């Protein structure tokens, strides 16, 4: 179930919340838009398999996705992607490549800007943690029905090596509108 980080009592900055209640991508001035949270996702590929996780807690708990999470102050997106893979799976991604970015606006006011990375390998042993259960998935059988609705719109570009820029509007777990451009 969807839950935003600020719902526990943190107040959203008014400049971040100003696009709350917008229900289409066209209603948002993306040049002025700012995310409440910068974050990353990293997808490790091994031959014809993709390393995914089933999230155990936080935003997207119960869903399948790539490892990732919110950036810490002073951290670059690449540093965050590596840290999150270590925390969630016990591995260090290698051959990290920036693949694209996705901007998400939720109608309740929460927003997140996700930098997406692809990795051609990793060091360490993949293990389950209290945050995530790992699963290697054949690239021709990605479990989109168990993922966020937007994933089926940009993950194929990631797998094909194409860079992308996505913008999405969500109400809870439901995607209301989207736009994905190739870079």
What is each residue range found by the language model?
Residues 4-9, 160-183:
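Charged phosphate-binding loop/patch that engages nucleotide di/tri-phosphates or the phosphate backbone
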Residues 45-49, 120-125, 161-162:
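Short, charged/polar surface micro-motifs in flexible loops or helix N-caps
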Residues 71-95, 103-158, 176-183:
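Unchanged
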Residues 25-51, 67-70:
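Conserved N-terminal beta-strand and adjoining loop/helix that marks the start
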Residues 61-63:
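A positional/architectural concept
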Residues 1-21:
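N-terminal amphipathic/basic-hydrophobic helices that include classical n-h-c signal peptides
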């Amino acid at each position: 179930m969807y839950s935003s980080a600020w719902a526990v009592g943190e107040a959203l900055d008014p400049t971040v919340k100003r696009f709350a209640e917008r229900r289409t991508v066209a209603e948002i001035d993306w040049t002025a838009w700012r995310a409440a949270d910068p974050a990353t996702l990293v997808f490790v590929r091994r031959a014809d398999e993709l390393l995914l996780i089933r999230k155990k807690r936080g935003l997207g708990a119960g869903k399948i996705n790539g490892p990732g999470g919110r950036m810490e102050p002073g951290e670059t997106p690449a540093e965050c992607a590596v840290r999150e893979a270590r925390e969630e799976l016990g591995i260090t991604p290698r051959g990290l490549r920036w693949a694209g970015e996705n901007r998400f606006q939720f109608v309740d006011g929460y927003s997140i800007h996700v930098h997406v990375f692809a990795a051609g390998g990793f060091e360490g042993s993949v293990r389950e943690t209290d945050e995530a259960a790992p699963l290697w998935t054949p690239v021709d059988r990605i479990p989109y029905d168990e993922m966020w609705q937007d994933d089926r719109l940009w993950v194929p570009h990631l797998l094909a090596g194409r860079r992308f820029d996505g913008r999405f509007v969500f109400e809870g777990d439901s995607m209301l509108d989207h736009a994905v451009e190739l870079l």
